[in-house]
């Protein structure tokens, strides 16, 4: 389970560096403690850190409101301690949330949430306090559903990602 943290992230850094690109990283709080070298290198590159739970084993559904509030605040604090920056964004582990998640994130000062796949444009969410923007998430090119649910292989996934990029790039020119 640690391939991404041992090998993949460094290859991605090289590619992003080659093209002078910054990244927004979905960051599990435990990565700050377990892989501080990733955090150090990301900070050198000016990356933005987005909350992504403690790890991908603890999902939000099934948590009562107080437990979820505590988990969100603990994750945000761990990432702030590890990176020096409080996350402005959130993507739930396995893109999971509860009915309370948007309100709890806004309450904690999070500015945007990436859990919803219902639009391809950002939109303001109705929350009890503060504000929260829903940022589009392209589950269509997420490796987990592509591989597990649709049986896509590496070449097919790569082509889907390139196709999506080409469409978005063309739309951006309009």
List PLM regions with ranges:
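Catalytic alpha-helical scaffold of carbohydrate-active enzymes acting on polysaccharides/glycoconjugates
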Residues: 1-134, 158-174
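Extended ligand-binding regions for polar small-molecule ligands
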Residues: 154-155
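Glycine-rich, positively charged active-site loop/lid region within alpha/beta enzyme cores that binds
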Residues: 133-151
């Amino acid at each position: 389970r640690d391939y991404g943290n041992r090998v993949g992230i460094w290859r991605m850094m090289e590619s992003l560096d080659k093209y002078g690109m910054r990244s927004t990283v979905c960051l599990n709080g435990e990565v700050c403690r377990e892989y501080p070298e990733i955090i150090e290198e990301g900070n050198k590159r000016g990356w933005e850190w987005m909350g992504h739970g403690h790890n991908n084993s603890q999902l939000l559904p099934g948590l009562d409101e107080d437990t979820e509030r505590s988990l969100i605040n603990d994750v945000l604090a761990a990432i702030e301690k590890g990176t020096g920056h409080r996350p402005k964004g959130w993507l739930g582990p396995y893109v999971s949330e509860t009915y309370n998640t948007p309100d709890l994130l806004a309450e904690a000062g999070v500015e945007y949430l990436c859990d919803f796949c219902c639009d391809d444009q950002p939109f303001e969410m109705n929350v009890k306090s503060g504000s929260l923007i829903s940022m589009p998430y392209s589950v269509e090119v997420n490796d987990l559903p592509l591989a597990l649910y649709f049986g896509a292989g590496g070449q097919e996934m790569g082509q889907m990602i390139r196709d999506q990029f080409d469409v978005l790039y063309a739309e951006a020119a309009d």
